[in-house]
Amino acid sequence: MKDVLSRIGIGSATVDTVLPTDSLRAGESVRAEIHVEGGSTDQDIDAVYFALETEYKSDEGYKDAIIDQWKLTEPFTIEAGEQRRFETTIDIPRETPVTTRSTAVEIETGLDISMAVDPGDEDYIEVEPTHRTQAVFDALDSLGFSLHASACEAAAGSLFTTSANFAQEFEFRPQRGEFADQVDEVEIVPVFDDDRLTVYLEVDRNAGLLSEMTDADERHTKLTVDAPDPDAIEPRLADAIRELS
């Protein structure tokens, strides 16, 4: 009877991912500890698997997106009540969205058990921008802009060199400085291609940047960021904003 219950998830083994911190930076790695505890009966575990997930907005509504996925360990047997711990390195891809009030990212951990309901664990994490993306944010701050909103949206694949089918858009509004009386907002979409960061930028448009780019609108520009240097990025951003405003 215990075997039957375990197969439908009752009294089955459990898994928990323990991170040293809830705040991670895109493009970096973190060591994690995986805790597996046996249930009421012995079970054969084919693998421990992970998925880094978020969601994005499309014309059909919100869709789930897997940013990255991988597996850990060779098959093993977890005995009833046994506790096992594994260590692994979790890589946070550079394309991972920055978490905000409207954007969430989670790590899902599961046990692959044949002929049974796979038990799992979900951990929401805070994702900070890559150093180069943060440098762009810092440059905008120096120009008097503050972040107003962000969202993950379906992207125009022909305009983005990326394997993802979505991109994160950030909307900044001027609070002070030269552009306070000149523009309503600046929208940017950072996109990584190999080791290069391209920042797509639009100024003072009613439609969102991703929507405009889908229509091949030419009222936008892009910048390439090679180093996390806000002082070098700031004048280039200022020139681009002036040209588009």
Model-derived features: where do they sit?
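Terminal, compositionally biased non-globular sequences in eukaryotic proteins
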Residues: 1-70, 74-245
